[in-house]
Amino acid sequence: MSTHSNHPFHLVDYSPWPLTGAIGAMTTVSGMVKWFHQYDMSLFLLGNIITILTVYQWWRDVSREGTYQGLHTY
């Protein structure tokens, strides 16, 4: 008997991007609250930078997985 079984659904690998996306969203919202209460907008900008970098790197990984590993279709 084979110990390998195919699943009817796609099992994803572990990824740091959901965690960094959540951190970026939390930082953005915290920065907006800080900015709306008459403070500077540095935390808001930091959150946006984290979110933009996360989105870029996450889609880079999706593109690589689809191109080199055949895991995603376009």
UniProtKB/Swiss-Prot annotation:
GO cellular component: mitochondrial inner membrane
Cited PROSITE patterns: COX3
Disulfide pairings: none
Keyword Mitochondrion part of the UniProt annotation: yes
InterPro entries according to UniProt: Cyt_c/ubiquinol_Oxase_su3, Cyt_c_oxidase-like_su3, Cyt_c_oxidase_su3-like_sf
BP GO annotations: mitochondrial electron transport, cytochrome c to oxygen
Principal location listed in the UniProt entry: mitochondrion
Transmembrane parts of this sequence: 15-37, 42-59
GO molecular function term, any single one: cytochrome-c oxidase activity
Pfam families tied to this protein: COX3
Catalysed reaction equations from the record: 4 Fe(II)-[cytochrome c] + O2 + 8 H(+)(in) = 4 Fe(III)-[cytochrome c] + 2 H2O + 4 H(+)(out)
SUPFAM superfamilies, alphabetized: Cytochrome c oxidase subunit III-like
Enzyme class: translocase
EC number assigned by the record: 7.1.1.9
Membrane topology: Multi-pass membrane protein
Compartments it resides in: Mitochondrion inner membrane
Keywords per UniProt: Membrane, Mitochondrion, Mitochondrion inner membrane, Translocase, Transmembrane, Transmembrane helix
Source species, domain of life: Eukaryota
Protein's job: Component of the cytochrome c oxidase, the last enzyme in the mitochondrial electron transport chain which drives oxidative phosphorylation. The respiratory chain contains 3 multisubunit complexes succinate dehydrogenase (complex II, CII), ubiquinol-cytochrome c oxidoreductase (cytochrome b-c1 complex, complex III, CIII) and cytochrome c oxidase (complex IV, CIV), that cooperate to transfer electrons derived from NADH and succinate to molecular oxygen, creating an electrochemical gradient over the inner membrane that drives transmembrane transport and the ATP synthase.
Subunit note: Component of the cytochrome c oxidase (complex IV, CIV), a multisubunit enzyme composed of a catalytic core of 3 subunits and several supernumerary subunits. The complex exists as a monomer or a dimer and forms supercomplexes (SCs) in the inner mitochondrial membrane with ubiquinol-cytochrome c oxidoreductase (cytochrome b-c1 complex, complex III, CIII).
Membership in a protein family: Belongs to the cytochrome c oxidase subunit 3 family.
Protein name: Cytochrome c oxidase subunit 3
Organism: Drosophila simulans (Fruit fly)
Higher taxonomy: Eukaryota, Metazoa, Ecdysozoa, Arthropoda, Hexapoda
